[in-house]
């Protein structure tokens, strides 16, 4: 996936930036096209260049995909295919004033938050206004892991987005330290912009 970037000198975090659409299209292409893979790279960039500043994570993740999907490499410690995917969003469920997110089996092993501030999560109500959210991991071992997301500013949430920005911030990964793919639970039309131009895009 395209790395995080900004055309401005200062680091700006824009949920309506067109790069969010690019990442979503890349994700959907991967999911519908045989013999393809998709590597997360937004966490390998910390500057305004569109090219990842840290090459090693991108190379390692790409090699994992090739070893697993092309050469059939196995993880000797698990007796299963070599893990190459980070957590992949599967479904959401509302629980009172919180939303619980589940991830595809096999991508969620060892699910954890790298940082205590759980950065990268946003939550919205029916007004479709997103607020920074708190998050924590539930379950594990014999119980499928999930992430619970909430915000005091959103008493009745209906949607969650994660790492949804031109410069995504994220903290969610699995036990192999592979980062979660950016995702959104909503299907609301998007209004990304490039410079001063606005576009409306339906999923």
Which residues does each predicted region cover?
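C-terminal beta-sandwich/jelly-roll accessory domains of carbohydrate-active enzymes
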Residues: 106-203
């Amino acid at each position: 996936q395209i790395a995080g970037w900004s055309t401005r000198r200062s680091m700006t975090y824009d949920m309506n930036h067109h790069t969010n659409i690019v990442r979503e299209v890349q994700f959907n292409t991967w999911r519908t096209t045989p013999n393809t893979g998709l590597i997360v790279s937004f966490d390998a960039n910390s500057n305004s260049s569109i090219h990842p500043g840290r090459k090693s994570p991108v190379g390692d993740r790409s090699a994992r995909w090739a070893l697993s999907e092309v050469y059939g490499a196995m993880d000797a410690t698990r007796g299963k295919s070599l893990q190459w995917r980070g957590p992949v969003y599967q479904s959401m469920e509302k629980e009172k004033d919180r939303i619980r997110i589940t991830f595809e089996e096999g991508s969620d092993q060892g699910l954890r938050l790298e940082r205590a501030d759980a950065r990268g999560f946003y939550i919205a109500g029916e007004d479709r206004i997103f607020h920074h959210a708190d998050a924590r991991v539930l379950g594990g071992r014999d119980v499928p892991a999930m992430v619970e997301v909430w915000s005091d500013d959103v008493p009745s949430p209906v949607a969650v987005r994660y790492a949804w920005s031109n410069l995504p911030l994220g903290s969610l990964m699995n036990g192999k330290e592979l980062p979660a793919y950016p995702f959104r639970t909503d299907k609301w039309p998007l209004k990304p912009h490039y410079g001063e131009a606005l576009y409306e895009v339906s999923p």
